[in-house]
From Swiss-Prot:
A GO molecular-function descriptor: protein phosphatase regulator activity
GO cellular component, one term: protein phosphatase 4 complex
Signal among keywords: no
Protein name: Serine/threonine-protein phosphatase 4 regulatory subunit 2
Gene source species: Kluyveromyces lactis (strain ATCC 8585 / CBS 2359 / DSM 70799 / NBRC 1267 / NRRL Y-1140 / WM37)
Keywords, ordered alphabetically: Nucleus
Subcellular location: Nucleus
Extent of Polar residues compositional bias: 371-396
Disulfide-bonded cysteines: none
Length: 402
């Protein structure tokens, strides 16, 4: 009996839920059915049908008792049913059909939604139609006011034809579509019949113009790209020429500087020898060590200049300002102050030879061959030994003595 203890309640619920017979609500008064139904869903269902735990689900049992009390006070005393009475009977008759055994909380929530209402239930008016025969459908039942005699049928056909003409008003649009389908266009407002052909020709001309414009734009883009490539090639060639000119100018400037230095050195040497009264050829034939060193150093400088001229300077060497300084041996040693003197003053001073160089000479030679360079241009007298020693002394040694 689905846990229902009252046989009378079980029969009523079976008739309502299974047979769908709602006349049972008219046979029994609400004051009798609602108290029995409330006791069943508030006490029997939670304790005997669901898995009830007193420690954890005592609150749910209290909520069901409040619902049963609400139905008795709100509807049973007024002898009325709530409008959800059919759904309440379904949940109370077979609760496990809708909820699992361990879902007592869901059952309580569903009962609260059905019981906490204010609207009363009212019986349905009229007779229930089972709709067993398809001809009993309203859409298939013939209309009563239409008669089926022959006269009415003739008049009905004329009436229907009038209705179709009124409803199917198209205001000439259908005829216009039919004419277009035939391939002819009767344009009365324009005054010519070949309007469609003219439009086709215009579209073709527009397409040709667009194609020509696209072709011209493509050609212009190709020409611009070629011009840019040519300009870039010209710029690269100009840059290479500028770099080559700069390197040539640098090499020419170095050659000119080296020539000026050689000329100045040669002029100083020639002037000094001329002022001393000794020809250049005789000076070069001297067997002294100083003359040999001067000639060899001059030849080495010329070889070095030729090697520098033969080599072309690279562009990257322009940033290298740490040039190597070469020390030139002029054949005589003097102080920096005397080296800056003009040529006339420099010539007036007597030429001096380092004692280190003079000491390396062969002692077997006579004094005349060693002091040949100390002959005065005004007289042919030889310089005394004391004067020779004084002249051959280095200025640096005099400074140390002081």
């Amino acid at each position: 009996m689905m846990g229902i203890k009252s046989r009378h309640l079980y029969d009523r619920l079976t008739k309502i839920v299974i047979d769908k017979d709602l006349s049972a609500f008219n046979e029994i008064s609400p004051s009798q059915l609602i108290p029995q139904l409330s006791e069943h869903f508030s006490i029997t269902i939670p304790k005997e049908i669901f898995n009830y735990n007193e420690d954890q689900e005592e609150d749910l049992l209290h909520r069901l008792k409040e619902l049963s009390r609400y139905l008795v006070v709100k509807f049973a005393k007024r002898d009325k049913y709530p409008f959800t009475i059919q759904r309440i009977c379904e949940l109370s008759y077979h609760p496990l059909q809708y909820f699992p055994v361990h879902s007592l909380q869901k059952f309580v929530s569903a009962m609260e939604k059905c019981c906490l209402v204010n609207t009363d239930w009212t019986p349905r008016l009229g007779k229930e139609c089972p709709n067993t025969n398809p001809m009993e459908d309203v859409s298939l039942i013939p209309i009563e006011w239409i008669r089926t005699n022959k006269e009415d049928e003739k008049s009905l056909q004329a009436f229907i034809s009038k209705i179709e003409t009124i409803v199917a008003v198209n205001f000439g649009y259908d005829d216009f579509d039919d004419d277009n389908e035939d391939g002819t266009d009767h344009d009365i407002g324009r005054g010519y019949d070949n309007h469609g052909d003219v439009l086709i020709e215009e579209y073709e001309e527009m397409d040709e113009e667009f194609e020509d414009e696209d072709y011209e734009d493509h050609e212009d883009e190709e020409e611009d790209e070629e011009d840019e490539d040519n300009d870039s090639d010209v710029d690269e060639m100009e840059a290479e020429e500028v770099e080559e000119d700069a390197s040539d100018d640098i090499s020419i400037g170095e050659i000119a500087e080296n020539d000026d230095q050689d000329n100045a050195h040669t002029d100083v040497t020639d002037t000094q020898l001329k002022y001393n009264g000794v020809p250049i050829e005789e000076e070069l034939r001297l067997s002294s060590t100083s003359s040999v060193l001067s000639v060899s150093s001059h030849a080495a400088n010329e070889d070095e200049n030729e090697s520098i001229l033969s080599r072309k300077r690279n562009v990257t060497e322009l940033d290298d300002y740490q040039y190597k300084e070469t020390k030139e041996n002029d054949g005589f040693i003097t102080t920096p102050k005397k080296s800056k003197m003009p040529l006339n003053e420099f010539g007036s001073s007597s030429s001096m030879v380092s004692p280190v160089v003079s000491n390396q000479e062969d002692p077997s030679r006579n004094d005349d061959s060693r002091i040949n360079t100390f002959i005065s241009p005004d007289t042919t007298n030889s310089v005394t030994q004391a004067e020779k020693n004084e002249l051959s002394t280095s200025p640096l040694q005099d400074k140390k003595r002081m």
